[in-house]
Swiss-Prot record:
Keyword field: ATP-binding, Cytoplasm, Ligase, Magnesium, Metal-binding, Nucleotide-binding, Purine biosynthesis
Organism whose genome encodes this protein: Saccharolobus islandicus (strain L.S.2.15 / Lassen #1) (Sulfolobus islandicus)
Residues the record marks as active site: 36, 84 (proton acceptor)
Main location: cytoplasm
Gene Ontology BP annotations: 'de novo' IMP biosynthetic process
Entries under PANTHER family matching the protein: PHOSPHORIBOSYLFORMYLGLYCINAMIDINE SYNTHASE SUBUNIT PURL
InterPro entries from the UniProt entry: PRibForGlyAmidine_synth_PurL (IPR010074), PurL_linker (IPR041609), PurM-like_C_dom (IPR010918), PurM-like_C_sf (IPR036676), PurM-like_N (IPR016188), PurM-like_N_sf (IPR036921)
Name of the protein in its database record: Phosphoribosylformylglycinamidine synthase subunit PurL
């Protein structure tokens, strides 16, 4: 049968049922109990993310398709992050496109209108042609769906590492807006409701949930990849929002198809589904395939009988299939029938309560012997600043219609965070952050660090973080060293979100990200954070003669840094000091509201040097004195490329105000230099470094490698 269940799980369900499941029931159990759908190896830890917050309307405790947070004036935002890693490794265009479609349906399942998308892409070394092909088609898939459906892609991440050569990561986040009294659940609380299905069911995506719950084994798994249809997705979006008031619950058909959607929607009640009533894309489909098909652009609605005709009529206007396929029952049994014959009859609670697993762990935290960095400053500057992680992503953004719906306030690449306008007149900033290199060194500090970095990035546009979702991407959880990094990352994320009082309202866990030889990816947890602009919005601009102020203390902490990755420098990973991140962020927000700064950039990937380079690419030069850097090392390379947290580079015409404001908050700040008109010149301690070639690489690298690939 090709099941992905463990023997202990198969024995467990036999004992609960007191019988042997039939072949179709085994396939249903395999889907519902898959790691992808059940979180059986992670759910016990995810509960630690729960924070009681008066703003949370729908959070991690509710365990629904997306989270929702009150933003005032009767409005709420809905937020979700998802991935389509395994499908994108096999069919990158459809894998990425269906990832966009799926997360949009998660947002509209809450009755919310999607207003923004973000994509976070990680692929392997671009010297390998397959990775260029993967990236080009991943971007094309995201663009094709997002542009066609009319939801702007407002930002994201793009990074490269050999660890993703066979297993790219394709994450998509979405934000929606809804009146808070109009939010829809994905679950029901009463029997008698009719189950209405919109969309055709085909043979694509068969076994997708199980496919996503094991390591990749080859391109013969192409049948598990769903096919995208953005124009059908647009109909689903528009009609779902139109009929939201007429339905009791809305559920996207994602992983596991109807088997999972019906079971989860029933919420402890039962359901009867008549398979012959399901509209099919392919004639004479096997009923078992109909149950677990993951064909896209389908939605399931729980509807009062009196409203069924009106709901289906709305779809009929678009000639879109809509059918009553069953109903919610009081008996807690999930039944799939075919012309009156029960093919599946399983207790709801048995399906919703799979065995939970706590796998062995093995401490892999590294104890590193510190050594003095002995590198040529000139070659280090040129090598690090030329790294693909630091180049402009404008070629990628240019593929997306990021201004559709005219709500985008800060364009992709113009700041550290994306900003969109909301119906209540407020501005919402959004940012995603991950750091797999740091996570491979110290997953606990990395967990704290990615939360802190997202918080700092929002501060650079004048926003304060208020809500987050997470995506945890790891290898096989049964491997002790993998499970250890997973548990440690959760510990760090939980500690940081509690410190900042930012509730995680949802997320995703993606295990089994390994190549065909069983080598896991670097641990890659991801945080997507959103927050409201607190007063004034900062749109970065660079002006001649502005003072360069370094906010925060620099430490010799090179572990997990880009410098360490390139030059194999042994060093301890940075210790994330959350209090410093909070206080330095408050200084930046205050300075923005007082109109004291024109430019703000948090210091992260590539260290101080990369942040200064971000000024230079605006067509200016920068001169600094490393002796002015407040630090625990005199080594110039260490000061320029350390990735200690809690730091910002800001441009101002009132540097003393910044220094005094920082002092009043308990944070150090120093005036380290000035902006000048020496285009593309970085001057360090009176020595000029001509970065014209690096600047040209910054603007043209992706187009030359991918656009012509």
């Amino acid at each position: 049968m090709g099941l992905n269940l463990l023997p202990i799980e198969m024995d467990d369900i036999r004992k609960r049922l007191d019988r042997e499941p039939n072949e179709i029931e085994w396939r249903v159990i395999d889907a519902v109990w898959s790691e992808h759908c059940s979180y059986k190896s992670s759910k016990i830890f995810l509960k630690s993310f729960s924070i009681d917050s008066p703003n949370v309307i729908m959070g991690i405790k509710d365990w629904q398709d997306a989270g929702a947070v009150d933003i005032g004036d009767g409005w709420a935002i809905v937020i979700k992050v998802e991935s389509h890693n395994h499908p994108s490794a096999i069919d990158p265009f459809n894998g990425a496109a269906t990832g966009v479609g799926g997360i949009i349906r998660d947002i509209i399942s809450k009755g919310a209108k999607p207003i923004a998308l973000m994509d976070m892409i990680r692929v392997g070394n671009l010297k390998i042609r397959k990775n260029v092909w993967l990236l080009k088609n991943i971007i094309a898939g995201i663009a094709a769906y997002g542009n066609s459906i009319g939801v702007p892609v407002v930002g994201g991440e793009l990074s490269f590492d050999d660890t993703y050569n066979d297993n790219p990561l394709v994450d998509v986040a979405a934000i929606g807006i809804v009146r808070k009294d109009k939010i829809k659940p994905s679950i029901v609380d009463k029997a008698g409701l009719k189950l209405v299905l919109a969309g055709l069911t085909g043979i694509d995506g068969l076994g997708g949930a199980s496919f996503a719950s094991r390591k990749l084994s080859g391109e013969d798994e192409i049948g598990a990849v769903q096919i995208a249809d953005p124009f059908a997705g647009k109909i689903i979006l528009d009609v779902t929002l139109e009929i939201a008031d007429k339905v009791e619950a809305i559920k996207d058909l994602g992983g596991g198809g109807l088997a999972v959607a019906v079971t989860e929607m029933a919420n402890g009640l039962g359901a009867i589904v008549d398979i012959e009533k399901i509209p099919l894309r392919v004639k004479n489909m096997d009923p078992a395939d109909v149950i677990i098909s993951e064909t896209q652009e389908r939605m399931l609605y729980a509807v009062e009988e009196k409203n069924v005709e009106e709901v289906c009529k709305a779809f009929e206007e678009y000639e879109y299939p809509c059918s009553v396929i069953g109903e919610i029952t009081s008996e807690p049994i999930i039944k799939f029938r075919y012309f009156g014959k029960d093919l599946v009859s399983l207790p709801t609670n048995a399906l919703l309560e799979p065995p939970k697993f706590l796998w062995p762990i093995k401490n892999v935290r590294k104890n590193v012997e510190e050594k003095n960095v002995d590198l040529s400053l000139e070659s280090t500057i040129y090598t690090v600043l030329s790294h693909p992680d630091l180049v402009s992503k404008e070629w990628v953004y240019s593929q997306f219609d990021y201004e559709v719906n005219t709500s985008t306030v800060v364009k992709p690449g113009d700041a550290n965070g994306a900003v969109v306008s909301l119906p209540n007149g407020k501005l919402l900033a959004i940012k995603a952050d991950g750091n797999p290199d740091l996570c491979s060194e110290d997953a606990y500090e990395c967990g704290k660090g990615i939360v802190a970095e997202a918080y700092r990035n929002l501060a650079t546009v004048g926003a304060r973080g208020m809500v987050a979702v997470d995506h945890l991407q790891f290898g096989d959880p049964k491997k002790p060293e993998v499970y250890y990094t997973f548990v440690e990352a959760i510990r760090g994320i939980g500690e940081a979100t509690r410190f900042f009082n930012i509730p995680i309202v949802g997320g995703k866990v993606s295990f089994y990200n390994e190549n065909s030889q069983g080598k896991p990816i670097k641990p890659t947890p991801l945080i997507v954070m959103a927050g409201l602009v607190q007063g004034k919005l900062l749109k970065n601009r660079v002006e001649d003669s502005s003072y360069v102020v370094l906010l925060g203390y620099t430490r010799k902490e090179l572990g997990g840094s880009l410098l360490s990755k390139i030059f194999k420098v042994p060093s301890q990973a940075p210790k994330v000091r959350l209090q410093e991140d909070l206080l330095s962020s408050e200084v930046v927000i205050d300075a923005i509201n007082e109109e004291k700064i024109t430019f703000a950039k948090d210091i992260s990937r590539g260290g101080l040097a990369a942040s200064l380079f971000n000024i230079i690419v605006h067509g200016y030069g920068v001169e600094i004195s490393t002796k002015s850097i407040l630090s625990d090392t005199d080594n110039v390379v260490e000061n320029l490329f350390s990735e200690s947290s809690g730091r910002f580079v800001i441009l101002t015409n009132e540097p003393e105000w910044i220094v005094e404001k920082s002092r009043s908050k308990g944070i150090v700040a120093s005036i380290i230099g000035k902006v000048n008109k020496k285009t593309s010149i970085l001057t360090i301690d009176n020595t000029d470094y001509d970065l014209k070639t690096i600047v040209n690489n910054y603007f043209n690298f992706l187009e030359e490698v991918i656009g012509n690939g």
